[in-house]
Amino acid sequence: MVPWVEKYRPRSLKELVNQDEAKKELAAWANEWARGSIPEPRAVLLHGPPGTGKTSAAYALAHDFGWDVIELNASDKRTRNVIEKIVGGASTSRSLLRMTREAGGDYEHVEGHSDRVLVLVDEVDGIDPREDRGGVTALTRAVRQARNPMVLVANDPWVLPKSLRDAVRMIEFRRLRVNDIVEALRRICEREGIEYEEVALRRIAKRARGDLRAAINDLEALARPTGRVTSDDVEALGWRDKEITIFEALGRIFNKPPRQARRALWNLDEDPDDVILWIAQNIPRAYRDPEEIARAYDYLSKADVFSSRAIETGDWRFKYVYATDLMTSGVAAARKGKPPGFVRFQPPKILRKLGTTRKEREVRNSIAKKIAERMHVSTRRAKMDVISVLEIAFRKVADNPTDRGLEILGGIAGYLELSKREIGFLCGDPQVAQRVYQRALRVREKLRKIRRERVKGAMESMLERKREESEVEEEAKEIEEAVEKAEEEEEREEKKKEGGGEQRTLDAFF
């Protein structure tokens, strides 16, 4: 069964998702070779994040121009002798193929119809200066003397020597956008006859973080068994937020030499204890030889012991240095034969179980919050004491659903304002849950009416009090005004009396 990543690998540069600038620059460089001239630089270095189409672009380019392809990747020895024999003095495709066989390499050969041969060196940034002694120096010399087009591929070009970077034309592949990945996933679903929800494809694309290869692997893992992919499928895999990176890390651990495998966890945002679970689950899938499996588990068990000592002693080097070295380099060193190549990795069973029960835990937490609000208890007590009692009561009625029992459950569910999903969780029977839910709706409506009437009565009572208070205020105001008026009258009368008793002078008689 061909993995979808290989099945839907682009056959032409036109099929490559996005990367318009990179495709244009790459095609212009290839056209110079096709016209019979030797461009300078003679090699290109395709660099960018994983899953952006670098290696696929090289094969698509060769297909467009009818070139054969000879690939050296990280699983091959890339010592000075091998590189010199393969690409050092190459001038024609036949001499290259002959040198490939003489070098004893197992390199992929893509049939074409041209005299040119494209030499592809993948994961150049993974060449180890100790294990592949002299490889980088020989590669730099081969690039400068190449008589055939050479394509180098790297995730991080800046770890390469400046001499090699100066000898190539660097072409950047940018991280893919979510919409680009969604469109590619949609085409695969349509070709495979997969039923899909648009939101599910978008969630897969977001989790991939610009890595189309990882997104396709994710889609295949979800859709191939059932023929469909829904948002619930993706939602249930909450523990898979870092799974794409984990896939890449596992690939390095099981396929790379120990020194390269050691770097597998450097950029992995995952707890080493979780990585141990992933490796333990997939050792039998990656290794077939019983001795290799035994050695791998032995290294892994030692890693687990060191990780535990970190907690006991507080010295975290046990976990993040010694344990990680054992679970990466150790497991890689357990392999004595050829690398397994592509492996369909599986998540740990315990994480899968947590993923499938995640929704149940969410429902239980939601019920506990409603109980805590209504009964004025803590959420913890609601979970431990109340929910278990409710489950017994609901399931007992579900086993023998009488009208009386359904009415009681409806009253409880209505009072707690439980949703149909929450009632179904307590009942365990969807049909009974529906009947209880209908009764609960009626109870909730009655409770709403009671609350509305109570609120209305309270409002009317408050308004009545305000009216009474207003009337009292008006009476008090009238009394106050009457008192003030009486006081003014009294003052005027007193003034008149005082004026009538004044003593007259002689001037008043003339």
UniProtKB/Swiss-Prot annotation:
GO biological process: DNA replication
Region feature Disordered, mapped onto this chain: 459-510
Entry-linked CDD domains: AAA, HLD_clamp_RFC
An annotated Gene Ontology molecular function: ATP hydrolysis activity
Keywords: ATP-binding, DNA replication, Nucleotide-binding
Membrane spanning residue stretches: none
Sequence ranges of Basic and acidic residues compositional bias: 493-510
Superkingdom of source: Archaea
Binding site for ATP: 48-55
Reported function: Part of the RFC clamp loader complex which loads the PCNA sliding clamp onto DNA.
Family label: Belongs to the activator 1 small subunits family. RfcL subfamily.
Subunit structure: Heteromultimer composed of small subunits (RfcS) and large subunits (RfcL).
Protein name: Replication factor C large subunit
Species name: Methanopyrus kandleri (strain AV19 / DSM 6324 / JCM 9639 / NBRC 100938)
Gene that this polypeptide is encoded by: rfcL
